[in-house]
């Protein structure tokens, strides 16, 4: 069975983005993201793809979901739906969903794992991670709170579905 992991950095109010960008810069979170996703297929929506500074993400199979039938994501595969994107991952051990908000919302009922960077900020934004229903998710691992090189407090948390 395919392990489906959602990976995200979330503010205290579950904000994940503002104006198609992350509202903070935590180099340690980027390093964790890279280390966790290398060698795995990563699935993202079109807006997330377009916001990436480097496309495709190297060392990973990039799959972009777009309802635009003729959408071209150079260096990536495209899929018309989350289900089609997951079907492209047949044979892989794990698929990592990396956003954005709409894709997280669709994927949450299918996810087996959550890899959340809890950012100790409450920010205004226009993209939010879905609420984590504690009746379905248990905390499997949590790092101590750390302070990033940019001065932002954060923790890495791994949730497993009950």
Curated annotation (Swiss-Prot):
The molecule here is called: Dihydrofolate reductase
Q: Which UniProt keyword terms apply here?
A: NADP, One-carbon metabolism, Oxidoreductase
| Binding-site positions, substrate | 7-9, 29, 60, 117
Keyword Oxidoreductase (UniProt): yes
This enzyme's EC code(s): 1.5.1.3
Q: For this protein, what reaction is catalysed?
A: (6S)-5,6,7,8-tetrahydrofolate + NADP(+) = 7,8-dihydrofolate + NADPH + H(+)
In which domain of life is the source organism classified?
Bacteria
GO CC: one term?
A: cytosol
* Record function comment: Key enzyme in folate metabolism. Catalyzes an essential reaction for de novo glycine and purine synthesis, and for DNA precursor synthesis.
Cystine pairs annotated here are none
Family indicated by similarity = Belongs to the dihydrofolate reductase family.
A molecular function GO annotation = dihydrofolate reductase activity
SUPFAM superfamilies named among the record's database cross-references? Dihydrofolate reductase-like
Q: Which GO biological process categories is it annotated with?
A: dihydrofolate metabolic process; folic acid metabolic process; one-carbon metabolic process; tetrahydrofolate biosynthetic process
| Ligand binding (NADP(+)) | 8-9, 16-21, 45-48, 65-68, 98-103
């Amino acid at each position: 069975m395919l392990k489906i992991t959602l990976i995200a950095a979330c503010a205290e109010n579950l904000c994940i983005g503002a104006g198609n960008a992350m509202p903070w810069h935590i180099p340690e979170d980027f390093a964790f993201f890279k280390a966790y996703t290398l060698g795995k297929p990563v699935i993202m929506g079109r807006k997330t793809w377009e916001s990436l500074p480097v496309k495709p993400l190297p060392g990973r199979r990039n799959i972009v979901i777009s309802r635009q039938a003729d959408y071209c994501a150079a260096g990536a595969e495209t899929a018309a739906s989350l289900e089609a994107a997951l079907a492209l991952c047949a044979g892989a051990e794990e698929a990592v969903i990396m956003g954005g908000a709409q894709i997280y919302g669709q994927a949450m009922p299918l996810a087996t794992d959550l890899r959340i960077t809890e950012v100790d900020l409450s920010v205004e934004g226009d993209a939010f991670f879905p609420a984590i229903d504690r009746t379905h998710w248990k905390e499997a691992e949590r790092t101590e709170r750390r302070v990033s090189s940019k001065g932002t407090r954060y923790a890495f948390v791994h949730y497993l579905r009950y």
